[in-house]
Every structure is written in structure tokens, then in C-alpha cells.
Curated annotation (Swiss-Prot):
Keywords: Cell inner membrane, Cell membrane, Hydrolase, Lipid biosynthesis, Lipid metabolism, Membrane. Coiled coil: none annotated. Transmembrane segments: none annotated. This is Probable lysophospholipase L2. It comes from Haemophilus influenzae (strain ATCC 51907 / DSM 11121 / KW20 / Rd).
Length: 313
């Protein structure tokens, strides 16, 4: 699957027209926040299978259209959605990566899945979640009744890389106590395009350039850095994981980026051991976004994912 040399042409001529066949739909989540989702449905299928894609912080459905395209052409119906406060969903605070309650992320996800899965009798349901989406999906899989057969967690947000963990967590807690939860965390601010060369997301300049173009052409989906409340709530959710993870009984594949600089891989390794049925695969020569990497890396990741999903456990 070689796309990089002609990615721009592929995206404009094939990917976007494909994705636009499936309109954005909306439903109301907790506190009446409007949630955006797309359901990519096969025209005819005797046996239907569903792939649920759960994106990460500051991401959006349009960014995930390439992966949706790939799974759709493997015969899946595909569900994508944007979390509250980002993408095409309603913002809690304009421009800022803010959150009211972490559990609302999980409740929103459950409501969207329930709505879509009521439309068809799916013989198989698979889930692929990335980073913050993997943290949310972990809570969903542990605490909600569901019919997901297997799940892939890509670079799960199971820990934050903090230079001074005790001091930094104290500052985060204090800022929330002092009523400063809606402020950007120190060092973060309004949306900026990612640097093609010096970024912590991917080695693939081609896909990063395309992501920047998406945000430039669709400024409404731009999102700045996280607030103190967002970080505080996510840290609390991470701390509760040792009690949450053991509840998940389905097979789990965890994708760990070798060159990770965003999430804490050491904490990930400790938590992976708590899953009843999980294995971790280290993706060589990959930064945080393993599914948006260079063609050769991405191809191998998808090969591993498909093997995991299609081989009987």
C-alpha cells in the first residue's frame, strides 16, 4: 500500500469524495453537548461487521478518513465520532482542549455506539482506539455492556511524561482548586500547525502536511492546547486504571511506539500486565501516531492489526 509519493492526489481525487458520501450526523451527549459522528455503511452485505474508530485529543473524523477508507475496503462498516469539545462536536470552551467530566467522554461514546449498532445486526464488532481515545475506550470496555469482540489500543494514554511529576501534579491540582481550570496549562496555547520536521507525532511529513492542510481548510476544527482541568481529570482517570483494566476480558492488542515522546511507555508496560488477555507489540521506527506513519511502518502496523483481528483467539 504505497501512497506517500502521490498522497495529495489520492486524498483529493479519491479519499475526500469517498468520505463525503457519508454525511456527518449528530446526537446529544451529556449536558446536551452536540456530538458529531459518521457511519460508513456498505451498500450490500450479507454478513455485516463493524469497525469503531476512537480518535485522540485534538483530533477529528476528517483526519481519520484514510484509516476509515482502509477498513471500509476490507468490508467493514465504519463508525467514527468526535469527542465532546473537539473536531466537529460542540466545544465546551472555544479553541481550548477542555473537559467538564471524564465520565462524559465514556457515556458519549456508549450512546453513539448504541445508536449505530441498533441499525444493523453486526456479526462482528471491532474497536481501534488511539491515545486519549484508548483511555476512554478502556473505561467503556470495562464498565459498559457491549458486543465488541476484539480491540486494538494504539499508543494508549496511560501516563503523561512529566519532567517533575510530583511538582507538576501539585501545580495542576492547585490551579484547579484556585478556579483556574479553564486556563491553558503552562507552555500551551492556541492552535498552531505542526512542524513537518520537528514534531513528536510522526516521521511521515506527507501525512503531517495533509493534516495541516485539513486544519487550514477547516478552521472550525482547530483546537489549542489542553486546560488544567482537562489534564487533572485525565490524570485521575489514569490513576484509577489498575482497578479498571482487569475487568476487560476480550482480546486486546496494544501498539507501543518505539520513539514515543508523548505518553509514558513505562507506565503502559506496567498496566498492560493487568489485562486478562492482552499482548503488546512495539512498533519500530514510529512516533506516537503509529497509524499515520510512513508507508512502510503503517503497512506493517495494519498487517499486525488485521492478523490479530482475523485470527481466532
Amino acid at each position: 500500500m504505497i501512497r506517500e509519493p502521490y498522497f495529495h492526489q489520492f486524498a483529493l481525487a479519491e479519499l475526500l469524495p469517498f468520505f463525503e458520501q457519508f454525511p456527518t450526523q449528530y446526537l446529544s451527549g451529556k449536558r446536551n453537548i452536540k456530538l458529531a459522528y459518521r457511519h460508513l455503511i456498505q451498500p450490500e452485505s450479507a454478513v455485516r461487521k463493524l469497525m469503531i474508530l476512537v480518535n485522540g485529543r485534538a483530533e477529528n473524523m476528517l483526519k481519520w478518513s484514510e484509516l476509515a477508507y482502509d477498513f471500509y475496503h476490507q468490508g467493514y462498516d465504519v463508525l467514527l465520532f468526535d469527542h465532546r469539545g473537539q473536531g466537529y462536536s460542540q466545544r465546551i470552551i472555544p479553541q481550548k482542549g477542555h473537559l467538564d467530566e471524564f465520565r462524559f467522554y465514556v457515556d458519549d461514546m456508549a450512546k453513539i455506539i448504541e445508536k449505530v449498532t441498533a441499525l444493523f445486526s453486526y456479526s462482528t464488532q471491532h474497536l481501534l482506539a488511539h491515545s486519549m481515545g484508548a483511555l476512554i475506550a478502556t473505561y467503556y470496555l470495562a464498565n459498559y455492556d457491549h458486543h465488541i469482540n476484539k480491540a486494538v489500543l494504539s499508543s494508549p494514554f496511560y501516563g503523561i511524561l512529566l519532567k517533575h511529576p510530583i511538582r507538576d501534579e501539585l501545580i495542576i491540582t492547585l490551579m484547579n482548586i484556585l478556579g483556574q481550570g479553564e486556563r491553558y496549562v503552562f507552555g500551551k496555547g492556541a492552535y498552531q500547525q505542526a512542524h513537518l520536521e520537528y514534531n513528536e507525532l510522526t516521521f511521515c511529513k506527507t501525512r503531517m502536511k495533509w493534516m495541516n492542510r485539513i486544519n487550514r481548510k477547516n478552521p472550525a476544527i482547530n483546537l489549542g492546547g489542553p486546560t488544567f482541568r482537562w489534564v487533572h481529570l485525565c490524570l485521575n482517570a489514569i490513576k484509577r486504571l489498575p482497578k479498571v483494566i482487569p475487568k476487560i476480558e476480550i482480546p486486546i492488542l496494544i501498539l507501543q511506539a518505539e520513539k514515543e515522546k508523548i505518553v509514558d511507555n513505562k507506565n503502559l508496560e506496567k498496566l498492560t500486565a493487568l489485562f486478562p488477555n492482552a499482548r503488546c507489540e512495539v512498533i519500530l521506527n514510529a512516533k506516537h501516531e503509529v497509524l499515520f506513519e510512513k508507508d512502510n511502518v503503517r503497512r506493517n502496523v495494519l498487517k499486525s492489526v488485521n492478523h490479530f483481528l482475523n485470527v481466532q483467539s
